[in-house]
Amino acid sequence: MSARVCKTHRVYVGRDVRNFMDIPDLIEIQLRSYDTFLHGARNTPSGADTLISGTREELGLEDVFKTTFPIESSTGDMTLEYQSYSLDEKNIKFSEAECKQKGLTYAIPLKALVDLRFNNTGEIRRKDIYMGDIPKMTERGTFIINGAERVVVSQIHRSPGVVFSHEKDKEGREVFSSRIIPYRGSWLEFEIDQKKDLIYAKLDKKRRILGTVFLRALHYETREQIIEAFYAIEKTPVCQDRAEYELLTGKILARSVTVENEQGETRVLYKAGEKIHPHVIDDLLQNGICEVYIINLEAEGSLRSAVVINCLEREEMKFSKSGAQDELSREEALCIVYSALRPSDPMTMDAAEKDLQTMFFSPRRYDLGRVGRYKLNKKFRSDSPTTECTLTLDDIVNTMKFLIRMYSGDAQEDDIDHLGNRRIRSVGELMTNTLKTAFLRMERIAKERMSSKETETIKPQDLISIKPIMAAIKEFFGASQLSQFMDQVNPLAELTHKRRLNALGPGGLSRERAGFEVRDVHYTHYGRMCPIETPEGPNIGLIVSMANYARVNGYGFLEVPYVRVRDGVVTKEIEYLDAMDEDRYYIGQDSTAVGPDGVIRVDHVSCRHRGDYSTRSPKDIQYMDVSPKQIISVSASLIPFLEHDDANRALMGSNMQRQGVPLIFPEPPRVGTGMEEKCAYDSGVLVKAKQDGTVAYVSSEKIVVCSAAASGEEQEVVYPLLKYQRTNQDTCYHQRPIVHVGDRVQVGDALADGPATYRGELALGRNILVGFVPWNGYNYEDAILISHRVVKEDMFTSVHIKEFSTEVRETKLGSERMTNDIPNKSEKNLDNLDAEGIIRIGSKVRAGDVLIGKITPKSESETTPEFRLLNSIFGEKAKEVRDSSLRVPHGVEGTVIDVQRLRRSEGDDLNPGVSEVVKVLIATKRKLREGDKMAGRHGNKGIVARILPEEDMPYLDDGTPLDVCLNPLGVPSRMNIGQILESELGLAGLRLDEWYESPVFQSPSNEQIGEKLMQAGFPTNSKVMLRDGRTGDYFQNPVFVGVIYFMKLAHLVDDKMHARSTGPYSLVTQQPLGGKAQFGGQRLGEMEVWALEAYGAANTLQELLTIKSDDMHGRSKIYEAIVKGEASSPTGIPESFNVLVQELRGLALDFTIYDAKGKQIPLTERDEEMTNKIGSKF
């Protein structure tokens, strides 16, 4: 028997649409990116321990080493050369489980083989150097940093390359500009001044320079060279023929016309770039010139605008010496460029040359990156090698040409929100950038050490400091905006977090600066980014999710698969296209009728081309979508009937599924979409078989599978199961076996369920019987009325695990001790503690109970002879100690399920001054109760308002009571009709005992749902007569009844409810603190004061503003009065008033208060002293 038998059998209901491809691995973006970072593009078999430099493509770590090395000393006598690196898989110190328990980082040692070469003698000293620990990614695509699971979110940012834009400035003038954006280095911008018809260059956002002046600084030294770079040139005869004469008039000379005088000297008659007028032709003929070279503005490849010629004229007017015929020299052009870059610095020719050279043409200062080069090649259809990562003169000329073409209407501007201009930086690339910066610091230190160490004794390991590397890694994983605490509420939350794309973070956008356009849905998002799943707050549109089939290519651009169509026939070829390639094709919809032979059976196909939607003949389309669900993300594709929901509610539905708490008894949805299995499988919470075999042993703690080894003998593979583990969000991570002894399993089969999964499918909630009927106002405004049966049968009961820890420290007065002998505590309070003062596993605890008894030495006052006598008699006990026990905080109760101890004496790495850390895990069983938030998959959320006895709930004619009553007014205005269709199909499934698969955009029609309802014996509109549970009478009208999949969300009332009688006060204002975390009070704000004033409740108001808040004197007096049973004394002055007085005194305003009798009221101790002094004088 195969383990596959355990799976829920689903009946497909919906339109017959062909899916050409299965969904790829959903966390591939994380795994592949980090694997490339660690190993490069591997050419050797996986698992090879060391790879010799040269067998890896220069990506990731290899790129980091190659960029930094060789490191040469300042004198040039020694060089550090890198040979290869290795990852020491065998020496990983701790396993994933140990790292989580001990609060460590799961990492792998990195070693580099480095040569120290002495250039004078040729001697080489080689050493394999430890370069620090690199965090290792788990199989689930996460990192364990300081014991907590973290995810590095991929960043979407503006791609390096060239961008052409056309916008209006503040004065309303049109500005045509282009920017060459490198991966690292200075920006180069060009803009056209429409008023003057000139092109300017801007280097690093400094003062603008005339375009031709910049070109002259880049070795385009003559007018002829500049003109040839931009225009087509042709030779033309000069003659007196009238027709030829007129044709030549108005043309522009491409080359200067020179003549020789009688002495044999050559002089320029007309410069290149000058316009030919009739008198010029006469002059040429008189000087015996028969042919000239002119610019052909209409020729192919030539610019049609004379912008460059205008620049040459402007340059001559502005810079040529009076009366001189000479052109601007390169040296003069360099001076102009340098003065624009560094206006205050003294100018030297060498400095100007070097500055410009390093700015754009030095690999150390300027890097286009592989992506930038790829983008430039694609834009200008050039074939520069991808290794050419600096700018070339051709790049600069091509940029200027394209900008001028755009200005003259021959080229289109770029759309900066197009996904061809935005790319993904995944974890591998982010780590590469972090390490490059760290290695630069290491290089500086190595150079300093080279000049200070003795040559005879120096070794490679003496020169390399790994501190900057370790610090950078720690800072990146611990503090970077993109390294996030993993959202671990349920498997879907984990999966979605790993597929998230973030436009924020270093080098990205900021919430404040991001406008509407960058947040909006763009046509290139189709199949790449989900148009639905995004947060609702200020991050809307900036944090998005990858679509189901999308992948990131080698350049970081999102690609989407399409099936190839040739002559109206759909082939089996799958091709991935990025956004730039896709713009060239017509792409048909997947809903098109296609025969088994691949022939498209309709005359007109709905298709897309760029942002336009139209219908075309099947022969006109080149590609077709591979699946209807390729445009949305994982969360959205779990919502059945998604196409019937309003976009806002679909967004809420997909976001709220991630908040569903794993239940003790989960159930997969009766109406699913077929994505449940894939989602659970790729999330990493299931235990999967690593090889074929037979299940030999099953228990709650492990599964043993016997499989045939290569030698022919049977070998046992043990799969341990995780039990009651705490997640990042305090939910319970628990695995249960789903196979039985004797089952045959294949590689990849699910052996055990994880949290929120059932039989290998995602199960975030429960299917419950719902009626859309008002009930005494208890389901007003989205409130939910629920049956006690749901609570009684633990349908929505979940387990939550909290961790509390304490440290045993060495103090200056002696060490802290754990003990069950705590001063001033009765034996009854300490019953559950063992001999060492630690709570016993299995104990039930409530708020205030001691978990770990601990005492701390107090500072000893001057010891009297009596105290010394007592100390000598009773020893330690008489010493003054303070109770510093770990107690259960307010609002927490549960059962102690585990106690973990980390001791320095046993080799655990603890903080300085800490000898032991003890962690206590408390599990709480949370039943559904009033105030808990619940939601369906269609954005239909609400709060449980009342739990009604089962017998009072409305019931069907056969006696079945409803589980939930929802308000019917919650549907029309929200326009989430998907919940209505889901409940109809779910009701039929309940009666027929069927589980349905209805994929997104392939949903069944009303007729198909009606057929199922008829089979089940229900009316086709799903409306039935309900009886009132209290009276047994029918309701006046038929009620819509169905089965909806509901989830309990992580917003539980137990975590939010809070009350305070006594508690801490603020040190300055003496008012109670705020918030549950600080055990604060309720704030009486302005509006609450107004309300009490309106009712004239003067005494209540005075009490709330004084003794119940910050009247310190009044507080103690009222306590005394209550204890003694006396009448309450009058209130004093609130402390916040004293604070105000002190602030006014700080402004040098003398402020004194007097009572009704004219006597001064002291506000501070100093005031009191002054008053007493004055009183004593009189």
UniProtKB/Swiss-Prot annotation:
<dbReference type="InterPro" id="IPR037033">
    <property type="entry name" value="DNA-dir_RNAP_su2_hyb_sf"/>
</dbReference>
<dbReference type="InterPro" id="IPR015712">
    <property type="entry name" value="DNA-dir_RNA_pol_su2"/>
</dbReference>
<dbReference type="InterPro" id="IPR007642">
    <property type="entry name" value="RNA_pol_Rpb2_2"/>
</dbReference>
<dbReference type="Pfam" id="PF04561">
    <property type="entry name" value="RNA_pol_Rpb2_2"/>
</dbReference>
<dbReference type="InterPro" id="IPR007641">
    <property type="entry name" value="RNA_pol_Rpb2_7"/>
</dbReference>
<dbReference type="InterPro" id="IPR037034">
    <property type="entry name" value="RNA_pol_Rpb2_2_sf"/>
</dbReference>
<dbReference type="Pfam" id="PF04563">
    <property type="entry name" value="RNA_pol_Rpb2_1"/>
</dbReference>
<dbReference type="InterPro" id="IPR007644">
    <property type="entry name" value="RNA_pol_bsu_protrusion"/>
</dbReference>
<dbReference type="InterPro" id="IPR007645">
    <property type="entry name" value="RNA_pol_Rpb2_3"/>
</dbReference>
<keyword id="KW-0240">DNA-directed RNA polymerase</keyword>
<comment type="similarity">
    <text>Belongs to the RNA polymerase beta chain family.</text>
</comment>
<comment type="subunit">
    <text>The RNAP catalytic core consists of 2 alpha, 1 beta, 1 beta' and 1 omega subunit. When a sigma factor is associated with the core the holoenzyme is formed, which can initiate transcription.</text>
</comment>
<dbReference type="Pfam" id="PF10385">
    <property type="entry name" value="RNA_pol_Rpb2_45"/>
</dbReference>
<dbReference type="InterPro" id="IPR010243">
    <property type="entry name" value="RNA_pol_bsu_bac"/>
</dbReference>
<keyword id="KW-0804">Transcription</keyword>
<dbReference type="GO" id="GO:0000428">
    <property type="term" value="C:DNA-directed RNA polymerase complex"/>
</dbReference>
<dbReference type="Pfam" id="PF04565">
    <property type="entry name" value="RNA_pol_Rpb2_3"/>
</dbReference>
<comment type="function">
    <text>DNA-dependent RNA polymerase catalyzes the transcription of DNA into RNA using the four ribonucleoside triphosphates as substrates.</text>
</comment>
<keyword id="KW-0808">Transferase</keyword>
<dbReference type="InterPro" id="IPR007121">
    <property type="entry name" value="RNA_pol_bsu_CS"/>
</dbReference>
<protein>
    <recommendedName>
        <fullName>DNA-directed RNA polymerase subunit beta</fullName>
        <ecNumber>2.7.7.6</ecNumber>
    </recommendedName>
</protein>
<dbReference type="GO" id="GO:0006351">
    <property type="term" value="P:DNA-templated transcription"/>
</dbReference>
<dbReference type="InterPro" id="IPR007120">
    <property type="entry name" value="DNA-dir_RNAP_su2_dom"/>
</dbReference>
<dbReference type="InterPro" id="IPR019462">
    <property type="entry name" value="DNA-dir_RNA_pol_bsu_external_1"/>
</dbReference>
<dbReference type="GO" id="GO:0032549">
    <property type="term" value="F:ribonucleoside binding"/>
</dbReference>
<dbReference type="GO" id="GO:0003677">
    <property type="term" value="F:DNA binding"/>
</dbReference>
<dbReference type="GO" id="GO:0003899">
    <property type="term" value="F:DNA-directed RNA polymerase activity"/>
</dbReference>
<dbReference type="Pfam" id="PF04560">
    <property type="entry name" value="RNA_pol_Rpb2_7"/>
</dbReference>
<dbReference type="Pfam" id="PF00562">
    <property type="entry name" value="RNA_pol_Rpb2_6"/>
</dbReference>
<dbReference type="InterPro" id="IPR014724">
    <property type="entry name" value="RNA_pol_RPB2_OB-fold"/>
</dbReference>
<keyword id="KW-0548">Nucleotidyltransferase</keyword>
